[in-house]
């Protein structure tokens, strides 16, 4: 039995962004070739975070972005300061906000492409609540600085008009956050408290925007932070981001960000939006493309303990996955007929399970984990240290434990995750 990913095919169009096009759209459409105004052709923009259970051809774009010294295998070979520096350099080389003369005002008319809702023409999806919003500027939404202007991300500087971190948001929702720091307790703003309000989508509240918010802040640090300072600034609080921690800052702690990042992994929404943001300004968010890189850069490995994880699948699979003592992970369980197990039991950890989604959240690891289900499943194995995963799309097994049993040329076109102990490899088969 083997598991594999498949790609949903879609066409891509080239976005040629023209500043202030809204003022002359009627005239220009009559005078210029329609190709000039080709917009981003994006896959369905879902408002729920159900993990990477399906992919679009965004992977083609992702693959071409990480090449040379920035190729995935090269990034995997380094950690910590060196990895931070490498990604910081990649962001500097590819971000074209200044080169393309894009500013804060341009965001108002780019969201209709980058954040558009394909279920309703001319509408966009609001950040934090998933609400359908009229894509025209002035229709009840504004621009949310996930890293507040009052705390450094002024709209006049590049960081303050970066498409990756400034999001279209329902005006009232934006006001409710204000400039509060992200966090879970006290006066912090917790994006987990916002419910999905778009009736066209399944309502999922658990961790809906926590992971999204964490990955934006980690992105901001990668692009605009200083190489070599992350440990001091995020752990000891005496360098680059000293003023950005706590209630008076931007986020509660790096521990909270990594927890949200691990327990609420990138959704299809984020993946597809990453394409649109790249079309707009040239660079991607590596933390969305390769979630494990955040752990390699920011995690304090002295706090990590190894536990074996056993699933009751058809073949006995008992790889050793690393888990922190305080944090868990999210995984998805699917039966071979496409349904989800009705019951799940776990020993060695605390957990919650949603049978309607097949989503199992291990909230705390206390010992050797054993995950059992009511029926044999196509399972998902998660490595919190490196975010290694075997996803549950129907198909053939790519790897078991340390051994690769599949011959890649025999596999269908798509992305495959090969998990090897605490390492994972993404292999794209064209």
Label each region the model flagged.
Residues 20, 376-378, 415-430:
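C-terminal tail/sorting-segment detector
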Residues 25-35:
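Bacterial N-terminal signal peptides
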Residues 37-130, 296-307:
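N-terminal module-boundary/linker segments of secreted carbohydrate-active enzymes
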Residues 132, 136-310:
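Domain-level detector of nuclease and nuclease-like folds
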Residues 309-374:
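Secondary-structure capping and domain/repeat boundary segments
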Residues 349, 412-415:
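A glycine-anchored, Pro-Gly-centered beta-turn/N-cap motif
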Residues 368-389, 403-410:
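Glycine-centered coil/turn sites that cap beta-strands in beta-rich domains
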């Amino acid at each position: 039995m083997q598991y594999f990913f498949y790609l949903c095919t879609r066409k891509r169009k080239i976005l040629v962004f023209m500043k202030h096009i809204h003022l002359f759209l009627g005239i220009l459409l009559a005078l210029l070739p329609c190709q000039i105004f080709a917009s981003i052709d994006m896959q369905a923009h879902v408002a729920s975070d159900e993990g990477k259970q399906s992919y679009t051809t965004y992977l083609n774009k992702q693959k071409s972005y990480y090449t040379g010294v920035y190729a995935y295998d090269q990034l995997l070979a380094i950690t910590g300061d060196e990895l931070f520096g490498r990604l910081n350099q990649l962001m500097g080389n590819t971000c074209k906000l200044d080169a393309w003369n894009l500013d804060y005002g341009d965001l108002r008319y780019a969201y209709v492409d980058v954040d558009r809702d394909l279920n309703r023409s001319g509408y966009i999806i609001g950040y934090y609540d998933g609400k359908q919003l009229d894509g025209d500027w002035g229709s009840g939404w504004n621009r949310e600085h996930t890293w507040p202007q009052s705390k450094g991300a002024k709209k006049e500087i590049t960081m303050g008009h970066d498409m990756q971190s400034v999001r279209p948001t329902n005006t009232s929702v934006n006001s409710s956050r204000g400039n509060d720091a992200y966090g879970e307790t006290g006066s912090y703003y917790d994006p987990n408290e916002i419910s999905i309000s778009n009736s066209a989508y399944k309502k999922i509240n658990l961790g809906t925007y926590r992971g999204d918010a964490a990955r934006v802040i980690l992105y901001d640090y990668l692009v605009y932070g200083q190489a070599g300072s992350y440990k001091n600034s995020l752990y000891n609080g005496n360098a680059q981001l000293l003023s950005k921690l706590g209630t008076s800052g931007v986020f509660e702690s790096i521990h909270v960000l990594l927890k949200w990042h691990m327990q609420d992994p990138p959704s299809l929404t984020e993946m597809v939006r990453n394409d649109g943001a790249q079309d707009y300004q040239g660079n991607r968010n590596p933390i969305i493309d390769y979630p494990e890189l955040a752990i390699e850069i920011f995690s304090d490995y002295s706090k990590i303990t190894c536990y074996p994880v056993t699933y009751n699948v058809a073949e006995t699979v008992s790889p050793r996955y690393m888990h922190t003592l305080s944090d868990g992970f999210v995984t998805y369980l699917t039966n071979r007929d496409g349904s989800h197990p009705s019951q799940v039991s776990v020993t060695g950890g605390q957990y919650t399970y949603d049978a309607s989604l097949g989503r199992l959240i291990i909230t705390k690891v206390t010992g050797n984990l054993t995950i059992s289900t009511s029926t044999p499943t196509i399972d998902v194995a998660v490595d919190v240290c490196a975010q290694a995963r075997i996803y549950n799309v129907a198909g053939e097994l790519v790897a078991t434990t340390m051994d690769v049993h599949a011959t890649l040329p025999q596999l269908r076109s798509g992305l495959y995750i090969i998990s090897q102990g605490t390492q994972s490899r993404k292999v794209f088969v064209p």
